[in-house]
């Protein structure tokens, strides 16, 4: 939405920063580009809201890829939560988990001061955190729908997010994929196709049935002008059937409506 928000990271951050209203006890900043962090910090200080920053106040360390997801430690202040595992793929998932835990620990610390809530830093609490994290299910977020054949589903709608997808594929030793792209024309479908072409044996374009989003075969024509060959399909089901006819691993990238349709199809099957 660059028309409404601006065409630079700093301009977009300036708009988004107004969620900091001065009423918050604390705000938490994920890993950011320097110009974005500068805007967010300036807003927090102007509104006199305390803030915590990834890499300074909390962070994920010792991040490893496994066949079951990500394994890592989370450091919050002087405390370390070791050997946490989440059934999601991508280094960013570990970093997002660190941010979420930092928020939760502060909320729990407040509760501990006000009640008889168990010590949040006890070994019992750490084990409970591990159990809950290992049971996370987050549809369409680097979700492995199948391991044989390999099918990865992610709600990626811009080229920047493709780097996370490609990083996962590199760590898993996967290449020459059939890539299904279901991204509306007002989003970065072209950037996603450009980014994924070097790991794609073929790129299949598709559309969701949600009338709120606009898809058309002009996407295929536009990419062809850049020398990127694609196959157009009129539905998610058609795209999946076409992908299934090939022996290659499958990566499905798309907007939330496309993700929902894929999930429904796999649930039925």
Role assignments for model-derived ranges:
Residues 238-267:
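A glycine-rich beta-strand to alpha-helix segment
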Residues 30-52, 150-151, 159, 193-249:
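C-terminal helical cap/extension that packs against the catalytic core
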Residues 18-27, 172-177, 199-202, 246:
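Short, surface-exposed connector motifs at secondary-structure boundaries
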Residues 5-6, 40-42, 164-166, 191-194, ...:
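Short amphipathic alpha-helical segments
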């Amino acid at each position: 939405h660059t028309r409404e928000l601006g065409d630079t990271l700093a301009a977009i951050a300036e708009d988004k920063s107004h969620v900091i209203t001065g009423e918050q006890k604390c705000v938490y900043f994920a890993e950011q580009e320097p110009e974005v962090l500068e805007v967010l910090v300036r807003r927090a200080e102007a509104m006199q809201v305390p803030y915590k920053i990834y890499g300074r106040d909390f962070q994920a360390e010792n991040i490893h890829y496994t066949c079951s997801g990500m394994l890592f430690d989370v450091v919050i202040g002087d405390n370390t939560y070791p050997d946490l595992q989440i059934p999601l793929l991508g280094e960013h998932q570990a970093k997002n988990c660190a941010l979420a835990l930092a928020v939760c620990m502060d909320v729990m610390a407040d509760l501990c001061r006000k009640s008889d809530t168990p010590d949040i830093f006890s070994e019992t609490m750490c084990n409970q955190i591990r159990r809950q994290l290992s049971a996370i299910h987050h549809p369409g977020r680097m979700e492995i729908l199948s391991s044989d054949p390999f099918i990865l589903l992610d709600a990626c709608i811009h080229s920047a997010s493709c780097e996370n997808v490609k990083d996962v594929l590199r760590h898993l030793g996967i290449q020459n994929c059939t890539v299904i792209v279901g991204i509306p024309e007002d989003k970065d479908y072209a950037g996603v196709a450009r980014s994924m072409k070097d790991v794609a044996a073929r790129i299949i374009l598709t559309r969701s049935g949600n009338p709120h989003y606009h898809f058309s075969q002009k996407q295929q024509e536009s990419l062809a002008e850049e020398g990127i060959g694609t196959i157009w399909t009129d539905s998610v089901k058609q795209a999946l059937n076409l992908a299934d006819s090939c022996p290659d691993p499958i990566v499905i990238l798309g907007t939330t409506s496309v993700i929902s349709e894929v999930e429904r199809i796999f649930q039925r099957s």
